[in-house]
């Protein structure tokens, strides 16, 4: 087992057994049991949790390859907590503060690490729900990570968004990148060389602060997706299947088939804030033509109708018999009508 690579995890009882069906899971019967699968992996392990979790840990592990850091749930009520609570719509009251703090926990592990690790990777405590721990105990994937990864790694799956990316509004998420976000960085396993973690953590902190202040929130995976596009010099990713199951990455890694990529830096492109875009249409005596234009938008590129903050019809018509039809169409397509008589195309601009 590679002693230069340490896994980092944490486990807290956030009372998911009290949530509605579909979200409820027993802490003891599900999370603790799956956590024990991870505890049986004989690698160096840094664990965050409340005091009572230590008994579970050291029934299985020794102090030699384990560092337990007591971290109570009050720690998650940090400077972002109230902002998260004001934005969230779900009743999963501690879920978002916890998952969005994984990066901070990984960085804390870097600071307190007693093993002097060269690589650190966050791993969800219950990842064995979908990923066999045999990849770590038998298939030497930690050795392969150490050999192949020289940037901060995210495992990503392709995602064609319509309205959101894990709760983060789309296309508004593109405000923070110079490209269209079409992949999601998984939160179950991420990390890399120790000397990359502090930088990525700082970028993540700034991004969380900015997006929350702008009124946007998804999960940690939404922010991971943005980081890939913003900082390709610091990050890399390996692509898995659309179902998002992380085992695919470890299977490829085991067989020396995993590929690692970085996003292409787009240069100093101006970032377009879609919330500040307006659409202007100039028309003259032809409401049917205006209607046809809007129908073509609806069929071929609905973003023209959905994204602009304002849609304005500059009506240059002199034929007053068209007024009622224009009024009807503006209500239909959500346009604000401005009448200036016939001021021409240049005057309209």
What residue spans do the PLM features occupy?
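Short loop->beta transition adjacent to catalytic acidic/histidine clusters or analogous donor-positioning motifs
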Residues: 5, 40-45, 66, 275-277, ...
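A conserved hydrophobic helix/loop-capping motif in glycosyltransferases and polysaccharide synthases
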Residues: 7-15, 277-289
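Short, well-formed alpha-helical segments that are part of the catalytic scaffolds
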Residues: 17-38, 53, 286-302
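Conserved short acidic donor-positioning loop in nucleotide-sugar-dependent glycosyltransferases
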Residues: 51, 285, 314-318
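Active-site-proximal specificity loops/subdomain of glycosyltransferases
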Residues: 62-114, 313-349
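GT-A fold catalytic core of metal-dependent nucleotide-sugar glycosyltransferases
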Residues: 100-155, 349
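Catalytic core and acceptor-binding pocket of nucleotide-sugar-dependent glycosyltransferases
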Residues: 129-133, 170-267
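Short beta-strand-to-loop element that shapes/binds the nucleotide-sugar donor at the catalytic cleft/hinge
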Residues: 152-167
């Amino acid at each position: 087992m590679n002693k230069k690579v340490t896994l980092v995890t944490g486990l807290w009882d956030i009372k998911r057994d009290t949530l509605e069906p579909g979200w409820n899971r027993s802490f003891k019967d599900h999370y603790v049991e799956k956590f024990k699968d991870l505890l049986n992996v004989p690698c160096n392990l840094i664990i965050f949790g409340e005091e009572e979790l230590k008994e579970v840990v050291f029934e299985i592990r020794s102090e030699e390859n384990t560092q337990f850091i007591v971290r109570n749930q009050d720690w998650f009520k940090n400077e972002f907590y109230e902002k998260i609570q004001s934005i969230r719509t779900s009743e999963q009251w501690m879920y978002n503060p916890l998952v969005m703090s994984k990066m901070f926990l990984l960085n804390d592990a870097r600071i307190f690490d007693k093993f002097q690790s060269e690589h650190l990777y966050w791993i969800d405590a219950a990842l064995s729900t979908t990923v066999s721990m045999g990849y770590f105990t038998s298939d030497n994937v930690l050795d392969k990570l150490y050999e192949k990864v020289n940037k901060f790694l995210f495992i990503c799956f392709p995602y064609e968004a319509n309205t959101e990316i894990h709760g983060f509004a789309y296309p508004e998420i593109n405000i923070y990148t110079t490209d269209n976000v079409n992949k999601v960085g998984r939160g179950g396993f991420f990390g890399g060389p120790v000397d990359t973690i502090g930088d990525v953590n700082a970028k993540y902190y700034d991004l969380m602060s900015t997006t929350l202040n702008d009124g946007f929130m998804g999960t940690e995976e939404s922010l991971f997706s943005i980081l890939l596009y913003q900082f390709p010099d610091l990050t890399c990713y390996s692509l898995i299947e659309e179902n998002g199951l992380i085992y695919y990455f470890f299977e490829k890694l085991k067989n020396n088939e995993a590929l690692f990529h970085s996003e292409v830096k787009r240069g100093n492109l101006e970032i377009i804030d879609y919330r500040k875009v307006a659409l202007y249409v100039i028309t003259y005596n032809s409401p049917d033509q205006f209607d046809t234009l809007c129908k073509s938008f609806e069929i071929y590129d609905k973003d023209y109708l959905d994204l602009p903050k304002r849609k304005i019809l500059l009506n240059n018509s002199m034929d007053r018999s068209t007024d009622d039809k224009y009024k009807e169409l503006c209500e239909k397509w959500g346009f604000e009508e401005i009448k200036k008589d016939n001021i021409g195309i240049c005057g309209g601009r």
